[in-house]
Amino acid sequence: KDRKLIVAGNWKMNKTVAESLDLVNHLTRELASVREVDMVVCPPFTALSDVAKIVLETDIRLGAQNMSENGIGAHTGEIAASMLKEFSVRYVILGHSERRQFQKESDELVSKKAHAAHAALIRPIVCVGELLEHRESGQTEDIVGTQLKGSLAGLSAEQMLETILAYEPVWAIGTGKTASPEQAQEVHAFIRGQ
């Protein structure tokens, strides 16, 4: 099956609302004729509403950087999938390496979030990747395989077709080391074989 490329921009905890609007207006002007790839922007939550108003009239899709595994309720600081849908969010990043590392998000939690995303008809972008010590000790496939198995647990075949897997070579982020295209392709091939 042919796959259309997806380019997703995670703005992380950068960009004020005004800066987000400047950036998305620039993107819509510069990328208006691009049809070969699906483009997704994932601004900070504070800018979702304003960015949504702009991208709804374009081919750029709106994504969120995270979401709760829970529905609406007493979950301070969280955001439910149904809330994201109000802004026409179509994608959500789950299991990003920073959330796994700093918020101690487990594969089990990522799986719960993926199920919640699918229930709301939001496409999860599930991130997997290994640290430098795993890469250097030859554990890449073990680590990535474990993350895949746990993060995708219980998803149906149909849900799997609507789930995007993103490989993050965590070992190459801020270390001065660079992941070569060949190294990334090796992991992509492993992921596809799972």
Q: Whereabouts are the PLM-identified features?
A:
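Active-site loop-to-helix "anion-binding N-cap" substructures in soluble metabolic enzymes
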Residues: 1-194
